[in-house]
């Protein structure tokens, strides 16, 4: 296996591949694509290789979140590496949660609209050929039910989100102290003369 050194082509390809989508899909594969949305990767966006900053990509089509492409510095300390990895893990966890949640929401919303239209005796299309919709009051029932049904899931998500962010903040503080300490150690000592 090629060495994954910062700046190496192998690392760049690996990073770009890990942040790329599944590529062009045929129409018959759309159902599979929707099923696999929970495990989807982010867009094909890849920052320039000479970049020395984190980049924010375009929104993911399933989670609607913008992925962050983290810069890997050449002289990254073990603590900085752990912080970056923790941030990447949190981002992937967040992407997966919202991709699953949005897929579930859209599916249940379509089923709700379809069942309500059938109960009214309407079809999925109006006489003019446009897609039939429900009014805001009818949709409010769906939103209320969906939120009630997913309350526990959202509570667990929020709890985990806060835990992860506190851990990231803690590591950011440690990294800041480590950097400050290394700068203090590098300063030349003044001699009295």
Curated annotation (Swiss-Prot):
It is found in: Mitochondrion inner membrane. GO terms for cellular component: matrix side of mitochondrial inner membrane; mitochondrion. GO terms for biological process: intrinsic apoptotic signaling pathway; mitochondrial cytochrome c oxidase assembly; negative regulation of reactive oxygen species biosynthetic process; protein stabilization; response to reactive oxygen species. InterPro entries: COA8 (IPR018796). Belongs to the COA8 family. Required for cytochrome c complex (COX) IV assembly and function Protects COX assembly from oxidation-induced degradation, COX being the terminal component of the mitochondrial respiratory chain. PANTHER family: APOPTOGENIC PROTEIN 1, MITOCHONDRIAL, CYTOCHROME C OXIDASE ASSEMBLY FACTOR 8. This is Cytochrome c oxidase assembly factor 8. It comes from Rattus norvegicus (Rat). The gene is Coa8.
